[in-house]
C-alpha cells in the first residue's frame, strides 16, 4: 500500500500518481478524488507534501486510494495496526463492503479478532510451510494452540 507515493509531491499529486500506478484513468481518479480525500480525512493537508504527513495520514491516504481503485483482489498487510480506532472501524466497514461486492481479500495480520470478523477462510503458515488451510474459525484455533 502506498507504493508509488513520492515524498516531495503533495497528497493531491500522489493521489493521481498512485491511482495511475494502480490502474485508474485520469477521469476515474478525478471522479473519485473527493471521495478519496473524504475517506482519508485529510482535507486540510491534501495540498501539503506527503513528507510532512504523519505515518497515519500517509497510510490513510494510501488505503483510501487503494480501495477506490475497485480492486477484484485486495491485499491488506497489517494496515489496520496503524491509525486510530474510528479510522480502523471505517476501514473494516470498507473491507466488508468490498467482500459483500464479491471481491477477494487477502489479509496478513496477527490480529485474530480482526481476521475472525472479516475473513471466512484462514491459511496458517509456520516457518514458511503450510500448517492449515480452511475455515477461519478453525485457523484461529490452530494459531491459538487448539489444534
What are these regions (language model features)?
Residues 16, 20, 28-45:
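Conserved ABC ATPase "signature" region
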Residues 88-101:
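Helical segment within the ABC ATPase nucleotide-binding domain
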Residues 115-117:
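A short, surface-exposed alpha-helical micro-motif characterized by mixed small hydrophobic
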Residues 127-128, 143:
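Conserved ABC ATPase "signature" C-loop
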Residues 133-134:
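ABC ATPase "signature
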Amino acid at each position: 500500500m502506498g507504493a508509488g507515493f513520492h515524498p516531495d509531491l503533495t497528497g493531491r499529486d500522489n493521489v493521481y500518481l498512485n491511482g495511475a500506478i494502480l490502474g485508474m484513468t485520469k477521469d476515474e481518479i478525478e471522479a473519485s478524488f473527493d471521495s478519496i480525500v473524504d475517506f482519508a480525512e485529510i482535507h486540510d493537508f491534501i495540498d501539503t507534501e506527503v513528507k510532512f504527513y504523519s505515518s497515519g495520514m500517509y497510510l490513510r491516504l494510501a488505503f483510501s486510494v487503494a480501495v477506490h481503485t475497485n480492486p477484484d483482489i485486495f491485499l491488506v498487510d497489517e494496515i489496520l495496526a496503524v491509525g486510530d480506532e474510528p479510522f480502523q472501524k471505517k476501514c473494516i466497514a470498507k473491507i466488508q463492503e468490498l467482500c459483500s461486492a464479491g471481491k477477494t481479500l487477502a489479509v496478513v495480520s496477527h490480529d485474530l479478532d480482526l481476521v475472525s470478523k472479516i475473513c471466512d477462510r484462514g491459511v496458517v503458515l509456520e516457518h514458511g510451510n503450510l500448517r492449515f488451510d480452511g475455515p477461519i474459525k478453525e485457523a484461529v484455533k490452530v494459531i491459538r494452540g487448539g489444534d
